[in-house]
Amino acid sequence: MEITKQQIIHTDVLIIGGGTAGCYAALTIREKSGAKIVIAEKANIKRSGCLAAGVNAINAYIVKGRKPQDYVDYARKDADEIVRGDLLLTMSEHLNEVTSKMEQLGLVILKDENGDYVARGNRNIKINGENIKPILADAVNQLDNVDVINHLNITDYIVEDNTIKGAFGFHMENGTAYEIRAKKVLCATGGAAGLYKPNNPGFSRHKMWYPPFNTGAGYAMGIDAGAEMTTFEMRFIALRCKDTIAPTGTIAQGVGAKQVNAKGEIYEDKYGITTSQRVYGTTQENLEGRGPCYLRTEGIEKEKDTDLKKAYLNMAPSQTLKWIEQGKDPSEQNVEIEGTEPYIVGGHTASGYWVNTNRETTIHGLYAAGDVAGGCPQKYVTGALVEGELAALDIVEKLKDQTFDITDNKEEQLLDEKVKEYNNILSDKDSIFTIEQMEEAMQKVMDAYAGGISSHYQFNENCLNLAKEKINNLITLSGQLSAQDYHELMFYYELKERLTICLTLIEHLKARKETRWHSFAENLDHPQKSDDWKKYVNTKKVDGKIKVILRELVKEDEHYEHQN
């Protein structure tokens, strides 16, 4: 099998990734301009990205009595200061606006007898959100002058003189190679799962917290193109219901369940209640022989059983099915919890592209929004929507103010070269290893030497140096891999993306000489927190090597612009 068909497309805006941020950016651009848009989506926008299975709450909302600065303060505290104040504030100021827009599109938001949204805690509101992604996708599909290309896997940016010109990719169903030339490009490809050995093995390995098909393509393409990245060392580890990997917040906030150990002792007060502290506390209780750990649901009111079962049907039905299979309701037994493997995801932590206040990266004309954008943790759904909107608004303004020539007399030659690269991988050459075996080897290395589950999320510099050496060996070996069809070709590039991210992640973990976030970055060589490290750890690939850049913190009242 080989790629024989080619297509060159010219457009005003290319959106890579038709998930939460990408779809909302398209809606905003078309509302504010007549720009032509191409959305390149690896799956199908109807059920792709983090919203594919739905959600049961809007976790970032300014409820009555609160203001945007309150949300900024919450996110800053959770990340222990390492956030971009400008990004958090501009996001927080628009959370309610995008929520209202989603309701207008058809999202069901629960209301009380007074017609007010039903709050869940200080920042959340309840929704019936199983169909939230189809709602968003349907709105995009109705837009004029928007070409959605599903099953198109983008593999490389086209960058000249640090300016984005477009991207290359291939279609996984018909094998067409694409070169898409654009005046502006928005990367909205999500975060990176599958770097570490997961909770569940074998056939169930994709039973994980984050979409297993979000493999960090946007990060990897940016790294290889010389974009500056930030705070990869702030990994995200989710505290989840054991085995089902269902959310714990639904129980903790829905019925006020506390974290308890096997002795019934509440331990969350001992370690703290930030996201990383909740994971760390659970890990420590298990290490010190007081596990397993649970959310204490035993004894809750019987009517809460039904509420919890219904809530999980909107996003994690396996948890409801587990209760039914066991023949015991939540009120009759506590829910066991565990930490997941680490992920790189800018929607929960501050890891991702280093962007200016308008979400433009250090590559001119390339924007990042949602999980792929760094500096702005605790985005959740609405934050990703806002970042898509903010990037879109700046794109519209720049398209008005600037003139562009996106044609290139080498277009056909460049696409021919990319097709040769694809077909070289699609060749019939014998390979000692399969792509899946190589992926498992990568995950084992990261798990053992870069702070995975088996090492209780801990690492030291010697281990990280070994991880770097072994990942580089795997990169060399991956050059011998081959793919039998277009689907396997996608797997090849997903592996390539993950290996690229692993190297950058390792450099970030080495660079921060402190432990600011337990479990997220548990550095045994530097177990204490230090004020000397109240700064961003950034990286940039220069001449094939990863260069570490330290930057000072940016506050809410600053409008940050790149100096390059």
Report residues per predicted region.
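Glycine-rich FAD pyrophosphate-binding loop
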Residues: 31-53
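Glycine-rich active-site loop/strand segments that organize a redox cofactor
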Residues: 59-91
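Long, amphipathic alpha-helical stalk/connector segments used for oligomerization, subunit docking
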Residues: 400-484
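Mobile, glycine/GP-rich and aromatic-enriched active-site lid/loop segments adjacent to catalytic centers
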Residues: 104-155, 231-380, 385, 448-564
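N-terminal Rossmann-like FAD-binding beta1-loop-alpha1 element of flavoenzymes
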Residues: 13-39
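Core beta-strand elements of the Rossmann-like FAD/NAD(P) dinucleotide-binding domain
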Residues: 8-11, 174-184, 362
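Glycine-rich loop(s) and the adjacent beta-strand/alpha-helix scaffold that form part
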Residues: 187-246, 381-394
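Helical element adjacent to the flavin cofactor pocket in flavoenzyme catalytic cores
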Residues: 129-156, 160-179, 219, 225
